[in-house]
């Protein structure tokens, strides 16, 4: 933490303490002037999504209501929503951050950017559009669903960039292949966000669409998508440390971890105007990547999101994250990127059934060997026995939004 970052943090602390909101109460006993080092800052309490829910509807705002130009809300489907207010400065800053993401991906004002994530209260679609407009590129604001229209506009508008969830990008790739229109598609790049995806899925989408792919990261509480993205070298995601301060903590103890160790990402906003966040626990699992990127950019890097602390399932005493399953599937010969895991409890024991798509199901011997290999890898790498099930390509459901991979029916 350099002096400039510390000064920005102290300015934000002063602002939130002066407002009559959540942080004023949480930080009431904190003397801002006493925070002189990184270690002093790390003594401050964390904030959680539950805290933000308790501030509903506008308890996070530290500016007068007349300065709030819009709100967005998290996409969670349970409980009280989290409302994040934005000033015009916040909107402009977000557009600048997203523009940087596009530039890192090699996208220019000559591109035509087809935007398929949702609009409305969600930050997804409008964030992609803000960045496109700031860049000067043509936005094609399709929104989610209506695959027929998506593919028609992709051809008619000769879109060069696809913005989508990985699940929907795969669905579009499969539909384009089925319809035999790949030669009429002019896509060059895909900017993919909103859900974690593995290398096998990345390879399928890149191959079937014939595009370069870029992971984009963000969350509604912190602007939205557009706060980090990988470059052409794909050695982690660059994030913008002039706007955001990242920490990686042990999710159990809250201890700040050394660079390179896997843990939970915690974000402090340095310039957020309407609703600053101090030490916000994202529950996203990643690590800081040290050293200079081959691209030469000075923005620091984190690894791709490997899962969430709340995505973890425990089976027979073993903690399992979706990222671990992705890594296993990647190494299974003839396995597609698509899988689903069902967990239930039978005869006093937990049972884990793993369905994986493959194109060898018509060959009984090959299918049997495939399932045997899958079972062996799970036992060797995670230490859990599974019931392996090979299914045909396309048997598992596709989604226009985020895909659910793990279904736990024990509780």
Regions of interest found by a model, annotated:
Residues 1-73, 78-96, 100-104, 108, ...:
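Nucleotide 5′-phosphate-binding alpha/beta core
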Residues 16, 132, 205, 329-333, ...:
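Hydrophobic C-terminal alpha-helix "anchor/cap" residues
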Residues 43, 47-214, 222, 226-232, ...:
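Active-site phosphate/ATP/adenylate-binding loop shared across adenylate-forming ligases
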Residues 69, 89, 93, 167, ...:
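Conserved active-site and cofactor/substrate-binding residues in soluble primary-metabolism enzymes
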